[in-house]
């Protein structure tokens, strides 16, 4: 009798699953770019309104993401152009998956800068696309000549550019991204998962550049648990994407919460500003520590390089602080760690451990 595993695709059998770290109680969780607090914390009237709306949400009915008013709320909050179409996803991860599926013709290639978000490469493998990774410069800036040469040589059907980049936090220049879009015949996805922490966006160009899709999420601005992502671009492309998205891919409670949050976006914006201020404070303090290199960040995290990433990771963990160890993920990330910007107290705890280790 054949093993059940013999019916599973060999390439999937060879893959490794993405591992979510278990976090012990009482730990400062600074490994996944989440908000350090509930986004409505300190706003009791909004908390009451939220609970009332959740209590009346029609959880006995299938959701209608396109008809619940969330798209209109997104357009209003983020000034999405009228000429652009919007597709909603169960997190931007789902949209990355289906955009990859959309373009995965036999022999098609995907291009992305590396180190970058690992789900780009994962989905290329899952859907049989040839993956072309273009290494960044040593300071994590974009090697534009190499990108343009790869575009010319491989003619990718799909290119992902994270703006700002994950896991480095470095933001490529707008001119570089515009050059990559102009050089590409295929679809270029500008992934702005961390765009709220950056001073620039390609959202105003959505719907105006035929091969551009702008990808965003609510996860990094306090709502990681909702799994709300959205893609916006020309109706001709987004309309094709909507054909393959599952019809009920979001839930009533997430849709209700997201719509309410966007109606009170001033509160969310204040939370973002607070994290940006903490990021700048952290970067300045890290810059005072010898034997450590902190890379400039336009995201809600800072990536650092230290003499021994394992030692710092373990020392932080002993002090009940969990960060992301990047060492070993890519040659350019040797002895690097990524630290999510947390509360002032959490950030001070991180700084205290690092100062004691490298004093």
UniProtKB/Swiss-Prot annotation:
Molecular function as annotated in GO: histidinol-phosphate transaminase activity; pyridoxal phosphate binding
Keywords recorded for this protein, A-Z: Amino-acid biosynthesis, Aminotransferase, Histidine biosynthesis, Pyridoxal phosphate, Transferase
Pathway where this protein functions: Amino-acid biosynthesis; L-histidine biosynthesis; L-histidine from 5-phospho-alpha-D-ribose 1-diphosphate: step 7/9
Coiled-coil zones: none
Cited InterPro entries: Aminotransferase_I/II_large, HisP_aminotrans, PyrdxlP-dep_Trfase, PyrdxlP-dep_Trfase_major, PyrdxlP-dep_Trfase_small
Reactions that this protein is recorded to catalyse: L-histidinol phosphate + 2-oxoglutarate = 3-(imidazol-4-yl)-2-oxopropyl phosphate + L-glutamate
TM region positions: none
EC number(s) given by UniProt: 2.6.1.9
PANTHER family to which the protein is assigned, alphabetical: HISTIDINOL-PHOSPHATE AMINOTRANSFERASE (PTHR42885:SF2), HISTIDINOL-PHOSPHATE AMINOTRANSFERASE-RELATED (PTHR42885)
Subunit comment: Homodimer.
One Gene Ontology biological process: L-histidine biosynthetic process
Family membership: Belongs to the class-II pyridoxal-phosphate-dependent aminotransferase family. Histidinol-phosphate aminotransferase subfamily.
Record-listed N6-(pyridoxal phosphate)lysine modification sites: 220
Name listed for the protein in its UniProt record: Histidinol-phosphate aminotransferase
Cofactor(s) essential for the protein: pyridoxal 5'-phosphate
Keyword Endoplasmic reticulum listed: no
Gene name per UniProt: hisC
